[in-house]
Amino acid sequence: MIKTTLLFFATALCEIIGCFLPWLWLKRGASVFLLLPAGIALALFVWLLTLHPAASGRVYAAYGGVYVCTALLWLRVVDGVKLSAYDWAGALVALCGMLIIVAGWGRT
């Protein structure tokens, strides 16, 4: 389960980077050349999703919980926003949901 969780975090990081770089270009006037690493990050994101040993719908559902946690870490580290108690509670609920889904992968 730890390997799966780490793979989800890597997947989420690729998705966030792949979306953040075009955001920098569109909102902050950064170089258009950021679209190239953004495209690479998004392609890596898609490839990483294929490495999970479950049906795609289950993978996407479980991945959503980890994405929430990763996005909140990004909010704290990159955007410099202090997380609220609601952020932490939401992350905990999302992560618990992911763990429940992943725990059932081999049982169905």
Swiss-Prot record:
Query: Which keywords are on file for this protein?
Result: Cell inner membrane, Cell membrane, Membrane, Transmembrane, Transmembrane helix
Coiled-coil zones? none
Q: Where does the record say this protein resides?
A: Cell inner membrane
Q: What's the protein's topology in the membrane? A: Multi-pass membrane protein
Task: Indicate where this protein is primarily found.
Answer: membrane
Answer yes or no on keyword Transferase: no
KW Cell inner membrane (keyword) present: yes
One family name in Pfam for this protein: UPF0060
Annotated InterPro entries: UPF0060 (IPR003844)
Q: Name one GO cellular component term.
A: plasma membrane
Span-the-membrane segments of this chain are: 6-26, 29-49, 61-81, 85-105
State the NCBIfam families in the record.
PRK02237.1
Describe the family membership recorded for this protein in Swiss-Prot or TrEMBL. Belongs to the UPF0060 family.
Q: Return the protein name.
A: UPF0060 membrane protein Ent638_1931
